[in-house]
């Protein structure tokens, strides 16, 4: 899969972001999270009105640096990420999801690099991520990129 690029999400991307996040949660956490916690997670993270509102928030607010989308050939969205710098010096990855057919092709890494660049621009010296489950399937991805456990569900890496 060839990655066309990473860009800031536009209003027309909201439905795709919502669907991709919900599908990723369902497929990644089946058998890890019980049905009710999974529904709550999807309801909290993937609600279309929430994502539409977040896309409309102008960039430049450190706590929320916006949604990014990765596109494949033809402009199809194949991955999404969101982050911010909620505490001075600490970047936070709020979401990162990649279409199953685009995984292991550098899409997640490209999204994380773009989000990290934004966070550095707002003074982040450390980057954190919190997982919905201790046995999160994304742990190897984050470990490969230099993250280490602060607690079973919270990981961090220095940004040098």
Per-range role (PLM):
Residues 106-108:
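Conserved G/P- and acidic residue-centered "switch" motifs that form tight phosphate/ATP-binding loops
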Residues 2-5:
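Extreme N-terminal starter segment of soluble prokaryotic enzymes
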Residues 8-12, 19-95, 99-101, 112-113, ...:
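Acetyl-CoA-dependent GNAT
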Residues 138:
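Helix-turn-helix
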């Amino acid at each position: 899969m060839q990655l066309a690029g990473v860009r800031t999400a536009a209003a027309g991307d909201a439905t795709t972001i919502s669907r991709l996040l919900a599908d990723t949660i369902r497929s990644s956490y089946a058998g890890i999270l019980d049905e009710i916690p999974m529904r709550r997670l999807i309801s909290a993270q993937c609600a279309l009105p929430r994502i539409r509102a977040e896309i409309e928030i102008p960039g430049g607010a450190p706590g929320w640096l916006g949604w990014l989308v990765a596109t494949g050939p033809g402009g199809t969205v194949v991955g999404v990420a969101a982050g911010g710098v909620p505490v001075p010096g600490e970047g936070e990855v709020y979401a990162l999801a990649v279409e199953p057919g685009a995984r292991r092709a550098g899409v997640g890494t490209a999204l994380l690099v773009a989000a990290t660049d934004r966070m550095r621009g707002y003074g982040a010296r450390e980057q954190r991520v919190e997982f919905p489950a201790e046995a999160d399937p994304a742990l190897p991805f984050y470990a490969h990129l230099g993250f280490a456990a602060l607690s079973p569900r919270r990981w961090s890496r220095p940004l040098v």
